[in-house]
Amino acid sequence: VIICFSNKSANRYNRDIRKALYGGDVPLRENDILLITQNNYRLGLMNGEFVPVLSVGARTQQSAPVYAQIGGKKERIVITLNFIQVTVPDSNGNPKPCMLLEDLLTSDKATISIDENRALYINFCMRHPDLKQDTEAFAEALLNDVYYNAIRAKYGYAVTGHKCQGGEWGKVFVDYTGRTGLDDDSLRWAYTATTRAQKTLYVSNLPHITPFSKFRIEPIQKCKNIP
């Protein structure tokens, strides 16, 4: 696995790796690896899990109007989200057909926007006009809706340091770009990423840290009189 600092870098690495694997910029296909980015209780898949794509089916779209902040004022826009029918193993390893939110899969962002989340909810309400909100039937239908509960995932060939926590791999490639400083956050990130390798570690843009990295020479200052 490749570990890097930003979602933008991870997305770029994933795109390049898939081009090398498949000979071009191809859509999601069978045997691709996904990294779950949000708990999906319907399938028992947790944030940070890696799952293989067992099969890929048809693509579909769902739309809804929302009021979004544009240029400092609210405007009514229509948001369209793209979905792919896929089969992945559930928490017990059994194949489960479900929907995957394609917009997030190749996005530089960590998650979908508030407006996109709102569009998912409004779209559900539009598809179920007979259900009243704040009822058990509404909650049950929402819990089992394939679009509202679509898998939110990224390609799992390259991940951020945040997402790699708790995982270990035999071979790990770490790109320290964006985390080469000596501040506490950078050092913690570097430690976490570096220690994910069980056997072999490959590095890029490694921070230059020596025993004197934090050594500083201060200007001579006048001391108070010593009695």
Task: State where each predicted segment sits.
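Core RecA-like ATPase module of SF1/SF2 helicases and allied nucleic-acid translocases
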Residues: 1-225
